[in-house]
Swiss-Prot record:
Superkingdom of source: Bacteria
Record's keyword annotation contains Kinase: no
Molecular function in Gene Ontology: ribosomal large subunit binding
Protein name listed in UniProt: Ribosome-recycling factor
Function: Responsible for the release of ribosomes from messenger RNA at the termination of protein biosynthesis. May increase the efficiency of translation by recycling ribosomes from one round of translation to another.
Gene Ontology process terms (BP): cytoplasmic translational termination
Subcellular location: Cytoplasm
Protein family membership: Belongs to the RRF family.
Keywords: Cytoplasm, Protein biosynthesis
Organism: Aliarcobacter butzleri (strain RM4018)
Amino acid sequence: MLQEVYAQTKEHMEKSIEALKKDYKSLRTGKVNTNILDGIKVDYYGTMTDLSQVGSVLATDATTITINPWEKNLLGTIEKAIQNANIGVNPNNDGQIIKLFFPPMTVEQRQETAKHAKTMTDNAKVAIRNIRQNSNNKVKTLLKDKAITEDESKKAQDEIQKITDSYVLKADETLKAKEKEILTV
C-alpha cells in the first residue's frame, strides 16, 4: 500500500518537473527557439490549427525564425496570427515565406526573463508540495482505517518528505541551468 503511495508521489512530482521544463521552452534565451511559436493558432479553412501544422518553422540563425507555409494563400493569415500573439516581433512577409527577426536581448530583458523562470519554478515547487500534502493525507487515511500502524505512518511521512526534498532540489537545479542559459550572452 505504502509503496503504491510512494510510486504515485514520484510519478506526479516527475510530471511537475516535466511541466516546468515545458514551460521553460516558452522563454526566450540568447538564441531564438521555435518553441516560442507553440500555442499560436492559425485559421486554416475555418479550423484553428497549430502554426507548426500549416508550414515548416525553422530557426535559421540565432536571431531569425522562418515560416514556410505549405500553401502560399495562408501567408496573410499566419502573419495576422503572429501579430495577435504578442511575442514581441513583427512578421516580415516577402510573398513566399515569413521571417521573424528577434533583436538581441538586453541585460534587462535577460534579467526579467530569469525572474519569470524563477516564478515558474516557484509554481512548480508549490505543485510538488501540494502533491506531498495529498500523499500525506492518503497515509493518514490508511492510519485511520487501521491499514497501517502509527510507526509505519511516521516512516511513510518521512519517506514522502525525502521524495519531496529531492524533487524540490531537482526544480532548483533545473532553474539554475535555465538561468545560466538565459543570462549567458
